[in-house]
């Protein structure tokens, strides 16, 4: 095809491009390429079209093809460049710079403007890719092209500026040529700026300087540029700062550098480089403090400057700030490491490591040696530097490696003999090894070479300080060296510290010593020894302000857990000045520093003690004692604090520990005496007199031991007098005190003293104390002691001369006390008491003394009370009442004023008397209050007509008066043992509380007191009470003897001895005494009682008719007694005479009020119903009475007892009744808990059903409360057996298998001690328990043990048929396990069962034997026999059990598919009878299973669902019902009901049904 045709097609392509029809373009170009494969334009057009159609790869290929065809043609390269710019593709971007380079080459000669554009694009592209060097070179080509065009300098400036910007990143990493290019750009740009000075010019200059500062080889140019900029901008900080840093790094300290630093600080006083520079200058000028200060401030601004950090470390070393120097060295090392490229970095690191090593070596911590050695290892060429070797030797020496240090020292001295450091190291070695003479020589050699070295002088002085005895006495040499060291190095704190030692210990100049210590501490505030010495001397010199200032300055700067010495001393200072809270705070801070310092804990304890924090003080001293067990002081303080807190027994133990450790320690002996004295006073306040006497005896013993060691101590004699005097309250017969002979002036070890002798000893002790020092308190104590002595004498004799003399002495002593200290109200009060006492009778003086006491102290309850008592003694009731009233207002808890008001109320006959006396007993125990309250309680109790009044219920019942009065009287009689009326009242109250033995003892004391007084009339009355109480406790012979001691003429005497004869079994003598009493009886009531007693005697003699006649005689009296009618009812019941019992009950009901004798009436009525066979009526009667009297616990207990015996089906209600009885009255709990447990056992309340309410738990409580009741142990045995059976049925582990024999032994031991119970009861209980134990052993498989126990029981009780039955059961079980039971054996078993004709369970057992042999008819006969027997006995449970067993027997036969229609009928009949008695799920289940076996589908589902969905059904019965119901529903394919059943099973946790359903589903 011709060239024209190609051109035509290309023309069409161009038209298509103009029309933007790029597909057409491709079509036309392809047509061209078919004609001409290497057509340049066609490939370019294809590239363009593909680019527009977003086909970049095709476009690139087309352009590349065009470039290959004609590489120097622009069109294709332009297209390729446009494509790469347009499309953001990685390979395109990478190739774009090459395209730009080609375009630059093509445009260079053709189009300058296009060249500039492409050059800018290429530079920008390099900059975007962070290729700054190529970008700069490209940009430099553009600048050259512009320069060739001779453009103006202001037009060139932006170009050069951009050039500097491109190369300013990572200047130090640029090659030399590029660096030169950068510097040339700066130098070319700066002249191009027209306006100078200007901000633009300044910024460019700064940029230039910044770049130069990064080029170490351009330091000269940097210095020149900075100087030029300073010339142009003299007030600008930046060039000065850079120039200063240049001087600092180069170590330049010339005038020029210092001038720079000064100018910089003039412009900015806080400028970092300026401060650093001046700091370096100060360091060279040896102004180390200023250098350290300036360098520290400067480095806060310029952190990364290794040379400055080295200078700072050097300055800090010079002023001995080792910790700060270590930080500075580390900073220098880090900075030099970061600037590793710098030529001086190695030198700086070596210097920093050396300084660090020196700081570690010279520091106080011995743990720094290893770190110092590591630092020295980092120094380059260290082994060739002798000075560094010397430092290494010191480090080894500090580490304790003396051999290594010695080797280094020797090498240094051999190789560098002129070196002072080697000799110094040798001197240190000798000094540490205490070779002081050798050390002196070496140190002097070192000083010869370096005489201005303060450290050498210090160690030489230290060597002299510890050298020989001569130098120890004469410290002149040492102090000379310390003075030189201090002069050469005024920052060496240890030199000043030892100068302080010299002035303090040798020169005796404490003021100058304090100055030296203070200077040492100021130089090194970590030197606690210097600070502590400065503070201690300041306090010693009385300069507390200076001491406090030092301590405060330390504590304010101290971190937590540091500066213990300062906190401790400041804490002690505050403790001394009474600022206890601050003291506690500071001592806590001291303990944070050292928690194991026992002294600190003791100081803290003292601080707490000073501010009244006894508990915290106690803890502190206990901690101190724990840390230092040998400290006597800590234990003593613990004991004394416990004594203060009132825990005297614990304090006694602590004091005893002190005595065990240190022997006879007087403070501990005194403390023991005080504690025992306080224990005695506490016991006296509680009326525990014998305990008080023991405590007083111990107090006297310990105080006497203390006096033996220190007889000069007044406090010991005073305490001993107090101990002897406080025994005044104890009765004479109770006081028998052993006293050391030293107190009595003889050589005997101990001597027994009675009460008057002990009181007299107390008086002598007060006299001895007065001889040591005469004080008012001692005179008063002596007077009180004399008063108590006189009162004791008057208590046993009438007023004697001795008593009068003692009273007179008492008054004179107290008057002496008043004269010495007339403002003491207690002395006036004591004077008043003595003056108005019996034997003195000076009431006027007493009144005056009491009033004076009140004037001395207005809030004086004792004086007001005594004044009231004085007025009451004189019969002035109104004034007495007013005085007591004031006393009550002053202290409402003061019991004596309340007693006074009670006595006034009693005198005037007020109804508040009893309330007042009761209030006194509630406040505290006092003899007057106790006896007064007991008197009013007994008086109220004796009035039997007021028992139903509200006043009685409040005063006696609600206020628990009998118990309160009994307790008060018990304490009263413990102290006052000769008051027969008190003992009479106590006996009366004991009888009310049913404390029979205690009542007997009280009446015996009354008899003994009256016999001593020979009061016949009162003695006869007391003998009556005593005889009655003896009879009550079962001492009948003693009671007969007691009554025989009376004239036996009064009614009470005769009835008392008659009762004693009856209880003794002497019926004839009893009848005789009762008949004699009948002759003296005055009222019909008394006669009725005697006739009733005679009837009881006749009944015991077997004369029933005579007894009945006597009781009938009682009933015809005008006022028949209730007791006689009750006895007549009981006689009718005993003889099973319903008519007699009913008639007597009707007569009884006529004479008994509704609220009286509720329990007895209910008991008799219910017994009659039971006798008539009306058991439910008996239950209803008990329920009716409970409904009428719900608060009567006896009725609830009776109902609980009645239910299991006569209506066992209501056992759950019986259990509730027993629980209520127990809750209402604890006195009935002994029986009520047992009744409740028996009911629970009868109701089947097991542990598995309820963990709280079950028979086992209830019986365990009963056994815990009443272990003496054998019935409880027998019932507990039954409960355990029931639990074992339930565990066996539920396939659970059994934990109570081996307890039956233990319980049996308990029953036997408890019944042996029961005398008041009929023998028949104990025999029955034992037999029942034996049977239960034998059954338990049999069930557990312990057959041989069961057989042996049964055989033994038969031998002991051959008439007990149950044992024979049990033996046959055991033998039968053995036979069944071995062979078939023969016919003769069955006959023998039947005979045994017939011998137990009252036991339906025996027939049950025989039926089971027949069943095991397949003899179903015989088994049926046995069940019918048991059913008949249970029906005859009215045994509801037995009847129910027999019917269910009969039904189960019938079901077994039916399930065996035996063709006999009688058995299904028998099952239906038996279960129907059961359901007539009660709703029984088991009976319904048996009917349902029968229907299931006979395929009665509808009836089966109804019956089984009735059991499954019935609430309250047992788990076992419900499971069996679900099992059969699931099989039935599955057979009927009733999926809906099956799902309902499965949900029910899941709700009740019946997993077995779920498993059965799976098996049935899989099998179908």
Swiss-Prot record:
Residue spans of the TPR repeats: 6-39, 40-73, 75-110, 116-149, 237-271, 306-339, 420-453, 456-492, 493-527, 564-597, 598-631, 633-665, 678-713, 743-776, 861-894, 980-1013, 1020-1050, 1051-1084, 1400-1433
The UniProt keyword set, sorted, is:
Repeat, TPR repeat
* The keyword Repeat belongs to this UniProt entry's keyword annotation: yes
Q: Which residues form a coiled coil?
A: none
The domain of life for this entry's organism is Eukaryota
Q: Which PROSITE patterns match?
A: TPR, TPR_REGION
InterPro entries assigned to the protein according to its UniProt record, in alphabetical order: Ski3/TTC37 (IPR039226), TPR-like_helical_dom_sf (IPR011990), TPR_rpt (IPR019734)
Record has Repeat as a keyword: yes
SMART domains to which the protein is assigned, alphabetical:
TPR
Kindly give the Gene3D superfamilies that the UniProt entry links to this protein: Tetratricopeptide repeat domain (1.25.40.10)
- An annotated GO cellular component: Ski complex
Instruction: Write out the GO biological process terms.
Output: nuclear-transcribed mRNA catabolic process
According to UniProt, the name of this protein is Tetratricopeptide repeat protein 37
Which organism was this protein described from?
Xenopus laevis
The organism that produces this protein has a lineage beginning with: Eukaryota, Metazoa, Chordata, Craniata, Vertebrata
Name of the gene this protein is made from = ttc37
């Amino acid at each position: 095809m011709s060239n024209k045709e190609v051109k035509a097609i290309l023309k069409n392509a161009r038209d298509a491009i103009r029309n933007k029809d790029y597909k057409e373009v491709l079509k036309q170009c392809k047509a061209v390429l078919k004609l001409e494969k290497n057509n340049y334009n066609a490939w370019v057009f294809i590239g363009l079209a593909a680019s527009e159609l977003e086909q970049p790869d095709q476009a690139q290929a087309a352009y590349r093809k065009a470039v290959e065809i004609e590489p120097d043609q622009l069109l294709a390269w332009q297209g390729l460049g446009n494509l790469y710019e347009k499309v953001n593709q990685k390979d395109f971007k990478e190739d774009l710079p090459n395209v730009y380079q080609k375009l630059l080459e093509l445009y260079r000669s053709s189009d300058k403007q296009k060249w500039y554009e492409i050059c800018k694009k290429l530079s920008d592209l390099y900059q975007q890719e962070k290729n700054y060097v190529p970008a700069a070179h490209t940009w430099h080509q553009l600048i050259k092209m512009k320069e060739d065009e001779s453009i103006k300098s202001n037009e060139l400036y932006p170009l050069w500026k951009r050039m500097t910007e491109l190369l300013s990143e990572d200047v130090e990493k640029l090659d030399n040529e590029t660096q030169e290019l950068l510097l040339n750009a700066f130098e070319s740009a700066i002249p191009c700026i027209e306006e100078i000075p200007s901000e633009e010019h300044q910024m460019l200059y700064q940029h230039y300087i910044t770049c130069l500062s990064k080029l170490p080889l351009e330091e000269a140019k940097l210095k020149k540029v900075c100087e030029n900029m300073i010339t142009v901008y003299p007030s600008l900080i930046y060039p000065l700062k850079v120039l200063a840093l240049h001087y600092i790094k180069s170590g330049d300290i010339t005038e020029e550098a210092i001038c720079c630093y000064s100018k910089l600080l003039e412009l900015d006083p806080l400028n970092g480089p300026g401060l650093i520079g001046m700091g370096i200058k100060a360091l060279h000028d040896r102004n180390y403090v200023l250098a350290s200060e300036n360098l520290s401030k400067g480095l806060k601004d310029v952190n990364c400057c290794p040379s400055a950090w080295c200078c700072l470390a050097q300055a800090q070393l010079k002023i001995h700030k080792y910790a700060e120097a270590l930080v500075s060295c580390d900073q220098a090392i880090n900075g030099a490491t970061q600037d590793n490229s710098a030529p001086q970095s190695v030198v700086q690191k070596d210097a920093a490591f050396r300084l660090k090593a020196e700081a570690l070596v010279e520091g106080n911590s011995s743990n720094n040696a290893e770190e110092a050695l590591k630092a020295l290892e980092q120094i380059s060429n260290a082994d060739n530097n002798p000075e560094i070797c010397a430092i290494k030797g010191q480090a080894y020496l500090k580490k304790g490696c003396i051999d290594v240090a010695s080797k280094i020292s020797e090498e240094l001295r051999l190789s560098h003999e002129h070196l002072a450091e080697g000799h110094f190291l040798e001197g240190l070695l000798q000094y540490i090894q205490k070779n002081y003479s050798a050390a002196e020589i070496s140190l002097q050699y070192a000083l010869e070479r370096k005489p201005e070295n303060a450290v050498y002088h210090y160690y030489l002085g230290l060597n002299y300080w510890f050298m020989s005895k001569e130098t120890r006495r004469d410290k002149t040499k040492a102090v000379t060296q310390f003075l030189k060291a201090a002069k050469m190095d005024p920052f060496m704190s240890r030199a000043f510290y030892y100068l302080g030692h010299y002035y303090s210990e040798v020169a005796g100049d404490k003021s100058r010593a304090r100055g030296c210590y203070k200077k040492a501490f100021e130089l090194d505030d970590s030197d606690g020894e210097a600070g502590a010495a400065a503070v201690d001397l300041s306090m010693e010199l009385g300069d507390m302000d200076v001491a406090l200032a030092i301590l405060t300055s330390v504590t304010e700067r101290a971190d937590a857990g540091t500066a213990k010495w300062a906190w401790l001393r400041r804490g002690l200072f505050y403790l001394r000045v009474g600022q206890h809270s601050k003291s506690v705070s500071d001592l806590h801070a001291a303990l944070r520093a050292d928690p194991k310092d026992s002294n600190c804990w003791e100081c803290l304890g003292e601080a707490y003690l000073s501010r009244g924090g006894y508990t915290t003080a106690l803890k502190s001293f206990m901690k101190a004692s724990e840390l230092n067990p040998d400290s006597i002081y800590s234990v003593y303080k613990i004991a004394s604090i416990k004594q203060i807190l009132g825990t005297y027994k614990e304090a006694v133990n602590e004091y005893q520990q002190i005595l065990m450790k240190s022997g006879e320690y007087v403070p501990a002996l005194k403390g023991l005496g005080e504690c025992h004295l306080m224990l005695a006073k506490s016991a006296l306040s509680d009326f525990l007199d014998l305990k008080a006497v023991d405590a007083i005896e111990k107090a006297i013993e310990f105080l006497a031991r203390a006096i033996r060691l220190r007889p000069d101590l007044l406090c010991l004699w005073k305490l001993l007098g107090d101990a002897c005097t406080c025994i005044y309250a104890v009765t004479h017969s109770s006081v028998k005190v052993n006293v050391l002979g030293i107190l009595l002036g003889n050589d005997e070890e101990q001597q027994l003293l009675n009460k008057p002798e002990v009181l007299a000893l107390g008086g002598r002790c007060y006299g001895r104390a007065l001889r040591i020092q005469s004080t008012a308190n001692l005179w008063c104590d002596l007077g009180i002691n004399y008063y108590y002595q006189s009162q004791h004498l008057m208590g046993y004799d009438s007023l004697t001369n001795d008593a009068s003399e003692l009273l007179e002495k008492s008054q004179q002593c107290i008057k002496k006390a008043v004269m010495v200290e007339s403002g003491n109200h207690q002395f006036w009060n004591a004077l008043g008491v003595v003056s108005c006492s019996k034997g003195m009778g000076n009431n006027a003086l007493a009144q005056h003394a009491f009033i004076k006491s009140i004037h001395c102290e207005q809030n004086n309850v004792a004086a007001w009370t005594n004044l009231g008592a004085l007025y009451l003694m004189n019969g002035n009731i109104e004034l007495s009442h007013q005085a007591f009233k004031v006393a009550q207002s002053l202290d409402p808890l003061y019991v004596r004023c309340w007693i006074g008001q009670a006595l006034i109320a009693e005198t005037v006959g007020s109804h508040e008397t009893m309330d007042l006396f009761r209030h006194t007993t509630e406040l505290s125990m006092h003899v007057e209050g106790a006896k007064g309250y007991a008197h009013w309680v007994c008086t109220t109790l004796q009035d039997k007509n007021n028992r139903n009044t509200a006043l009685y219920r409040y005063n006696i019942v609600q206020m628990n008066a009998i118990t309160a009065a009994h307790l008060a009287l018990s304490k009263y009689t413990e102290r006052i043992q000769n008051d027969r009326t008190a003992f009479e009242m106590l006996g009366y109250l004991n009888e009310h509380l049913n404390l029979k033995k205690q009542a007997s003892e009280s009446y015996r004391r009354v008899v003994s007191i009256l016999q001593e007084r020979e009061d016949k009339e009162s003695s006869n009355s007391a003998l009556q009470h005593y005889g009655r109480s003896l009879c009550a406790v079962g001492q009948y012979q003693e009671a007969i003897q007691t009554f025989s001691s009376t004239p036996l003429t009064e009614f009470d005497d005769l009835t008392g001895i008659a009762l004693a004869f009856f209880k003794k079994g002497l019926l004839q003598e009893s009848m005789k005494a009762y008949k004699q009493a009948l002759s003296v009886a005055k009222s019909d009531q008394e006669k009725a009682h005697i006739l009733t007693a005679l009837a009881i005697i006749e009944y015991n003699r077997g004369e029933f008719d005579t007894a009945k006649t006597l009781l009938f005689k009682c009933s015809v009296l005008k006022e028949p007694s209730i007791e006689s009618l009750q006895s007549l009812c009981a006689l009718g019941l005993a003889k099973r005479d319903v008519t007699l019992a009913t008639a007597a009950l009707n007569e009884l009901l006529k004479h008994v009020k509704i609220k009286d004798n509720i329990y007895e009436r209910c008991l008799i009525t219910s017994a009659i119903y039971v006798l008539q066979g009306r058991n439910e009526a008996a239950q209803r009667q008990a329920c009716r009475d409970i409904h009428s009297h719900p608060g009567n616990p006896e009725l609830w207990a009776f109902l609980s007892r009645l239910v299991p015996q006569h209506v066992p089906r209501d056992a759950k209600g019986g259990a509730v009744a027993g629980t209520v009885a127990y809750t209402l009255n604890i006195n009935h709990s002994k029986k009520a808990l047992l009744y409740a447990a028996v009911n629970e056992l009868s109701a089947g309340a097991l542990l598995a059903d309820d963990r709280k309410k079950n028979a086992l738990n209830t019986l365990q409580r009963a056994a815990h409360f009443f272990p003496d009741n054998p019935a409880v142990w027998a019932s507990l045995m039954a409960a355990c057996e029931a639990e074992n059976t339930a565990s066996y049925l539920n396939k659970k582990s059994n934990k109570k298998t081996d307890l039956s024999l233990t319980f049996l032994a308990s029953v036997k031991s408890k019944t042996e001690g029961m005398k008041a119970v009929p023998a028949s009861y104990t025999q029955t209980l034992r037999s029942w328990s034996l049977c239960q134990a034998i059954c338990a052993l049999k069930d557990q498989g312990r057959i041989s043990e069961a057989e042996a126990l049964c055989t033994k029981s038969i031998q002991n009780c051959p008439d007990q048929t149950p044992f024979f039955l049990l033996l046959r059961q055991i033998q039968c079980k053995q036979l069944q396990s071995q062979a078939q039971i023969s016919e003769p054996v069955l006959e023998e078993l039947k005979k045994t069962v017939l011998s137990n004709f009252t036991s339906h369970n025996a027939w049950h057992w025989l039926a089971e034997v027949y069943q095991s042999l397949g003899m179903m008819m015989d088994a049926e006969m046995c069940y019918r026999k048991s059913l008949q027997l249970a029906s005859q006995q009215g045994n509801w449970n037995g009847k129910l059990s027999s019917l269910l067993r009969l039904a189960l027997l019938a079901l077994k036969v039916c399930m065996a598919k035996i063709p006999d229609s009688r058995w299904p009928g028998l099952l239906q009949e038996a279960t129907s009878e059961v359901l007539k008695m009660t709703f029984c799920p088991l009976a319904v289940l048996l009917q349902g299973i029968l229907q299931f076996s006979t395929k009665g589908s509808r009836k089966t589902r109804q019956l089984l669902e009735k059991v499954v969905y019935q609430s309250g059904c047992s788990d076992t019965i419900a499971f069996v019902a679900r099992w059969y119901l699931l099989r039935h529903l599955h057979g009927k394919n009733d999926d809906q009901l099956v799902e309902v059943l499965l949900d029910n099973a899941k709700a009740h946790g019946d997993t077995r049904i779920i498993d059965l359903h799976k098996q049935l589903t899989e099998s179908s």
